[in-house]
């Protein structure tokens, strides 16, 4: 359990879904923290010092403890501050949350973003592949307010920071609705529920500014191929 007097700092990047989800967890737990904005293309001396292995955000500094990788940080936060749990207590349910969270970051993320830079199979095929993956989450959230049940939890933070506010906005750059409501009614209901949660709204980048930045990132990435 965390001590009363402590120091919590978070190194993040304003459009990074990985640092946004960590902020959601800290806010849900009511943990006071200092946010340090990073300019990832330049990588500050502090970031390289605190995360020499991956050289990326998020990095959580809790007193003298350093943590990187968003899933690791989320679990640490949940185990350190016991209020408002974000992971279920049941071992099987907890394992399934971890499974789907990895699915979002390790399966949906690369398949969802790479075609924006280089669609080797064509855009139409890429869209179909992405939507096939999203359909798994559509089924998983059916009949629930959130993946975590009545309140947001670990998977809501992982999927919520990635799919509606990152993946969907990236495809909007091409004028494509990646999650049409007639195909994904449950995901869209879940997204609406997310938008009603204050800590989620506080952590999501402004839409127009976000899309403009993503357009630049996509164009820069295209120039490397």
From Swiss-Prot:
The modification Phosphothreonine is found at residue 151. Residues 6-85 form the GST N-terminal domain. Signal peptide: none annotated. Glutathione binds at residues 16-17, 42-43, 56-57, 69-70. Gene3D superfamilies: 1.20.1050.10, Glutaredoxin. Residues 90-217 form the GST C-terminal domain. It is found in: Cytoplasm, Cytosol. May be involved in the conjugation of reduced glutathione to a wide number of exogenous and endogenous hydrophobic electrophiles and have a detoxification role against certain herbicides. PANTHER family: GLUTATHIONE S-TRANSFERASE U2, GLUTATHIONE S-TRANSFERASE, GST, SUPERFAMILY, GST DOMAIN CONTAINING. This is Glutathione S-transferase U2. It comes from Arabidopsis thaliana. The gene is GSTU2.
